[in-house]
């Protein structure tokens, strides 16, 4: 069972941690738009799920500096003589400054035992990106210009939206008011818009692509055949439309294997605001970027080309942001 269920679990983690092209579509949701960098657009509370399409920069324009955490637990179980359960956990944390600097970390424990967990942390401070893998030293990333750092941050921050995408049509029903961090908030109850509604279809396999192997076939079976069976949750929105707290508990079946059940629980919340959020500072004594093989660097230096290379500004890669 563990071999059968684990690919499904990894498919879910891949879908949740790599938000992909759906981000652009999500940001076009009604109610999600933002104005220029100084003034966010008025939020449309008739479409509260649009709040989950706001990125971290959008939210900081509405709330100022903030600290945010999220935990996501995925589990896959299968009934029968070989019944077993596989579990994985994601943990995310973001500190976002109103100045645009940020610190983000993401960890995944795939449930495979000691040493299987992995993670990454990225800091964007003072126009420089710094990154490290879990247990590794900090390194500078001078060629990033913030693009990859922001993508990594936004993948974490969009975790609630990614989970709800697996659920298909979702209803958000007004459920009164609450107070979060001393701020008034509107509460919405989350549920499936129609019982047993199919989730969006997975992208079609490219023409001419080779037949998938056994594990890939299991992943595709879930992504293409998942059936949302239940959803219970709540969404609390600030008066500006920024999401202050999200809770989601959802379950899925698989069309071609009724013995398989997948469940996910997510809890995300803003933990601090304004002066409660520590300043975003560069890490102490980061190492230089070492992604260029040492042998290549040595050969350039020996040939007298390294100084010239360092003196000439690097050409921006396609899609890079302007240097800051």
What are these regions (language model features)?
Residues 7-11:
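Small-residue packing motifs within transmembrane alpha-helices
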Residues 13-16:
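C-terminal motif of bacterial Sec signal peptides marking the signal peptidase cleavage site
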Residues 1-6:
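Bacterial N-terminal signal peptides that target proteins for export
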């Amino acid at each position: 069972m563990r071999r059968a269920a684990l690919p499904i679990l990894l498919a879910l983690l891949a879908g949740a941690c790599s938000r992909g092209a759906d981000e652009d579509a999500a940001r076009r949701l009604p109610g999600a738009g933002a104005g220029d960098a100084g003034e966010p657009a008025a939020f449309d509370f008739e479409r509260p799920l649009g709040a989950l399409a706001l990125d971290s920069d959008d939210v900081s324009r509405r709330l100022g500096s903030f600290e945010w955490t999220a935990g996501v637990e995925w589990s896959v179980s299968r009934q029968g003589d070989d019944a077993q359960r596989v579990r994985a956990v994601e943990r995310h944390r973001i500190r976002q400054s109103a100045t645009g600097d940020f610190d983000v970390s993401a960890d995944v424990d795939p449930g495979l035992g000691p040493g299987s967990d992995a993670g990454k942390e990225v800091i964007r401070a003072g126009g420089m990106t710094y990154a490290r893998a879990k247990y590794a030293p900090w390194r500078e990333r001078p060629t990033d210009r913030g693009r990859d750092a922001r993508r990594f941050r936004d993948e974490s921050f969009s975790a609630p939206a990614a989970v709800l995408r697996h659920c298909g049509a979702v209803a958000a029903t007004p459920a009164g008011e609450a107070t979060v961090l001393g701020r008034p908030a509107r509460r919405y109850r989350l549920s499936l818009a129609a019982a047993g509604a199919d989730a969006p279809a997975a992208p079609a396999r490219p023409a001419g692509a080779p037949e998938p192997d056994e594990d890939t076939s299991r992943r595709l079976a879930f992504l293409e055949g998942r059936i949302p069976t239940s959803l219970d949750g709540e969404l609390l929105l600030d008066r500006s439309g920024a999401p202050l707290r999200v809770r989601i508990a959802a379950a899925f079946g698989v069309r071609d294997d009724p013995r398989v059940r997948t469940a996910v629980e997510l809890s995300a919340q803003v933990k601090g605001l304004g002066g409660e959020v520590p300043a975003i500072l560069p890490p102490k004594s980061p190492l230089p970027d070492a992604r260029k093989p040492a042998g290549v660097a040595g050969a350039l230096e020996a040939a007298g080309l390294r100084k010239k290379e360092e003196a000439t500004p690097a050409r921006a890669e396609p899609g890079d942001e302007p240097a800051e």
